[in-house]
Amino acid sequence: MFPMVTGFMNYGQQTIRAARYIGQSFMITLSQANRLPVTIQYPYEKLIPSERFRGRIHFEFDKCIACEVCVRVCPIDLPVVDWKFETDIRKKRLLNYSIDFGICIFCGNCVEYCPTNCLSMTEEYELATYDRHELNYNQIALGRLPMSVIDDFTIRTVLNSPQRKNV
């Protein structure tokens, strides 16, 4: 008869322990319920990238001296620099500059080591296309500045959202 009594005591202790664990997890869930959501509705709301964000590369054709430092410091030898040596002025003349963003790892070495600062990182991160060949940007596509996220009236940033203003 004693094993039966100890079995009921163990069952009672296990039931109390299970109820306590359920109560603790329920309290944790309730404490998280009154927080603001961390996720955003991406196509309609966008986060503002930080200052050091490494997005699409912006290229200024007039500043480039065709030194090819960007190609040498790139871990995957990505930038394609076509130039012609002008014998009368004894300088290189840049003909074409292109970067394939389908292969680029956005390390920022080309921007950091460029002696004339003709390369810079923008805050543009939406580079999705249906064809991977459209990710090969030449000097014309690299020279366009991206439209700012804040200027687009169809997109609300997290700082400008109506939910944020009410709180």
UniProtKB/Swiss-Prot annotation:
It catalyses: a plastoquinone + NADH + (n+1) H(+)(in) = a plastoquinol + NAD(+) + n H(+)(out); a plastoquinone + NADPH + (n+1) H(+)(in) = a plastoquinol + NADP(+) + n H(+)(out). Keywords: 4Fe-4S, Chloroplast, Iron, Iron-sulfur, Membrane, Metal-binding, NAD, NADP, Plastid, Plastoquinone, Quinone, Repeat, Thylakoid, Translocase. Residues 55-84, 95-124 form the 4Fe-4S ferredoxin-type domain. Its EC number is 7.1.1.-. Its cofactor is [4Fe-4S] cluster. InterPro entries: 4Fe4S_Fe-S-bd, 4Fe4S_Fe_S_CS, NADH_quinone_OxRdtase_chainI, NDHI. Binds 2 [4Fe-4S] clusters per subunit. NDH shuttles electrons from NAD(P)H:plastoquinone, via FMN and iron-sulfur (Fe-S) centers, to quinones in the photosynthetic chain and possibly in a chloroplast respiratory chain. The immediate electron acceptor for the enzyme in this species is believed to be plastoquinone. Couples the redox reaction to proton translocation, and thus conserves the redox energy in a proton gradient. Belongs to the complex I 23 kDa subunit family. NDH is composed of at least 16 different subunits, 5 of which are encoded in the nucleus. This is NAD(P)H-quinone oxidoreductase subunit I, chloroplastic. It comes from Citrus sinensis (Sweet orange). The lineage of its organism: Eukaryota, Viridiplantae, Streptophyta, Embryophyta, Tracheophyta.
